[in-house]
Amino acid sequence: GLPCGIAGVRHSVPAARYLQLVERIQDYITAGDCYQVNLTFALDFDFYGDPLALYRRLRERQQVSYGAFIALDDGHILSFSPELFVQRRGTTLVAKPMKGTMHRGGTPAADDALRDKLAQDEKNRAEHVMIVDLLRNDLGRLARIGGVQVDRLFEIEDYATLFQMTSTIRGEIDESVTLDRVVEALFPCGSVTGAPKLRAMEIIAETESRPRGLYCGAMGTLDPNGDFCFNVPIRTLVLDGAGRGSLGIGSAIVHDSRAVDEYAECNLKSSFLTGLDPGFCLIETMRCDAVGFLNLELHLARLTASASYFGFSCDCDAIRTGLDQLRGSPAGSTPWKARVLLSKDGEWTLERVALGKGSAGLPLMLAPRRTDSGNILLRHKTTARRLYDDEFARALTAGYCDALFGNERGEVTEASRGNVFVKLDGVWYTPPVSCGLLPGVMRSLVLRDPRYSARERTIRMEDLPRAQGMLLTNSVRGVLDVRLGAASRSCAVAMQQ
């Protein structure tokens, strides 16, 4: 399927600010205001691809009992919550608070050791008991006298990236207890507030920089007979309709919490999302001749920027050394191109490819399929370029040098193998990146070259028939004079009419 994932992850609270907030909360704890506060922040990000496909990929990584995919008019909710807030079956209420986290090991033996470590850890058990007691008291407001019991205390559940400590609390209620009474007594879940609940919520309102929204609320199902089941929407993505999303994460702060450890725990909890392999590699292709690699630092700068955006590890010094070795000595006089492939885990490969004869003098073909200007992948050089490869092959078969694309608004974007410049009314123009295209290295050089005095401007397909010239640019071939093929020119004229 088509790639789907996230990029451009941004913390709503910087690490330094988070450490300050932990200190403030611990001052409240020392003063006796509370004994536990759940401190949270958000990861904001861009997403690409189909939300349902993203849900399926993440569900493979986060096998949970209380997940949900909800399509809304203005976005989607992708919940991968492992935590039960409250469930009703007849006259029985069940809550299953989750508090206590440990990372997974690399081997079964390491997993066993870490699982046991979490189960016996005094700090995690103390935090957990605080919330179990809080939930027992909340359920006690609804249950019959003596009707609350803890069935399973300090259970450890296994997930793909971590272990979690849970307990199961059961309360027997009268048949007359209604949903609104349950919500009034239990909401919000104590595991995401702290204890005592009301004072913890006041401190949260003072310290957290923005409302939590759905995160830490409740979502679930209602049955006609009055039964229901609600999760706590932790590990839950909220996606809008414009390619942006957020994920709330947090941890419990107590008097002996170490702020750096709590911040690391938050990052561990979000790793099911941030560690998702995007299903593609980053690419850089550059020309090499007797002098060396052309515009090497510009290529490595673009690779570094894309790696940062998509969360790839990238060691440019190692890649630079590898390129020097690939080039060898002496360099030789026949130009060739080097191709760099970088995967998310930082692994990279280099390939030396001979330059073909090219297709100078052949015209451009208008690609029949449009691109989406909002597709963030178009702004980065990746292996997720099936549409471009298909249209390039179609163009070559039909006797053209390349395929020229337009977006959903009828704006010219780029060719499958380079950027395009169009001369209109005596001035060279190239489409802005916002139209949905790669900011090519050669494109940036031409924009800075006084010989062209080129500018960025939206170019519509119907502008092409009156073009006084066209250039195709890429860092391997340089700047090529091209023209629109007769059939494609006729199509552009038809658009104009």
Residue ranges and their predicted role:
Residues 1-282, 407:
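Extended alpha-helical targeting/anchoring segments
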Residues 128, 165, 232, 249, ...:
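Helix-start/capping segments and mature chain N-termini
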